[in-house]
Amino acid sequence: MTAPSKPVLVADIGGTNARFALADIDASVPLLDDTCREFAVVEFGSLGEAARYYLDQIGVQATKGVFAVAGRVDGDEARITNHPWVISRSRTATMLGFSTLHLINDFAAQAMAISLLRPQDVVQVGGASWRPAPIELPRNYGVIGPGTGLGVGGLIIRNGRCFPLETEGGHVSFPPGTPEEIRVLEILSEQFGRVSNERLICGPGLVNIHRALSEIAGIDPGPLEPKDITARAAAGDPRASRTIDLFCAIFGAIAGDMVLMQGAWDGVFLTGGLVPKVLDSLQHSGFRQRFEHKGRFSAIMSRVPSLAVMHPHAGLLGAAAYAVDAERALPGEQR
């Protein structure tokens, strides 16, 4: 590994794992893949300890950092969902000897990654073909990702600058589109009261859909995990297969609604840990039909690309993109 002259430490911090890498903001591909490392967060008392351990192991001293965290960033602090770490930007920067440290939401990083994605990093799920555009061209992109929950955001590119759009779109109320989905909504409403999109389109959402379909059929499915449902579907189980099909159709409807709400006419990127596991189903299900089925806007929607992100370190890539964009900021401009 050849260390960059001005290395930036980038991180993608989840509830279970902490991923680190170095970025070279002057390189055409700023994320240095051979520096990527992953650690269990339970092995460290704080984010600063984990970052210091990484830098010591790799033998490089950075002076700047961009850390994407799976939780809400509120001023100087961020709390990681499903983990007791409370991160202070200022204290962590002091501990590491950084002149600059940015804390961003992990889904803001997923959105920022769009600016650095290459054709080989994505798989087309439908719509018009997509190729990266010069950063000088204005673009509006959407990003949506089912994992433990459902992340929804976007990326606005103007005048060579990237602006991630952070939302809580996963918590928008679920709009059923068929009689079957209305029945699923009724069943889930008995458990949750209000039913959001996230109750269906995420890993636990697979379980919720399967349970509702089982109740409709008068069958007790017993306790299941998302991986059990995908495995049963792969083995040809009819109810598990229908669960995956319904998941993909609803996912498409929600992703299409996001385009209309954000004006993301230049493309939608599907990210998150669940997407690669259901990729074949996305390509051969009702995903695109429901994505495009938007009444008077159906013709326009048919031209909007939808792309599955397959980059193994999209969160780190997005943090690197944020570091690059921060360097483009004018003096005195806040980033």
Swiss-Prot record:
<keyword id="KW-0547">Nucleotide-binding</keyword>
<comment type="similarity">
    <text>Belongs to the bacterial glucokinase family.</text>
</comment>
<dbReference type="GO" id="GO:0004340">
    <property type="term" value="F:glucokinase activity"/>
</dbReference>
<feature type="binding site">
    <location>
        <begin position="11"/>
        <end position="16"/>
    </location>
    <ligand>
        <name>ATP</name>
    </ligand>
</feature>
<dbReference type="GO" id="GO:0005536">
    <property type="term" value="F:D-glucose binding"/>
</dbReference>
<protein>
    <recommendedName>
        <fullName>Glucokinase</fullName>
        <ecNumber>2.7.1.2</ecNumber>
    </recommendedName>
</protein>
<keyword id="KW-0324">Glycolysis</keyword>
<dbReference type="GO" id="GO:0006096">
    <property type="term" value="P:glycolytic process"/>
</dbReference>
<dbReference type="InterPro" id="IPR050201">
    <property type="entry name" value="Bacterial_glucokinase"/>
</dbReference>
<keyword id="KW-0963">Cytoplasm</keyword>
<dbReference type="InterPro" id="IPR043129">
    <property type="entry name" value="ATPase_NBD"/>
</dbReference>
<keyword id="KW-0067">ATP-binding</keyword>
<dbReference type="InterPro" id="IPR003836">
    <property type="entry name" value="Glucokinase"/>
</dbReference>
<keyword id="KW-0808">Transferase</keyword>
<keyword id="KW-0418">Kinase</keyword>
<dbReference type="GO" id="GO:0005829">
    <property type="term" value="C:cytosol"/>
</dbReference>
<dbReference type="GO" id="GO:0005524">
    <property type="term" value="F:ATP binding"/>
</dbReference>
<dbReference type="Pfam" id="PF02685">
    <property type="entry name" value="Glucokinase"/>
</dbReference>
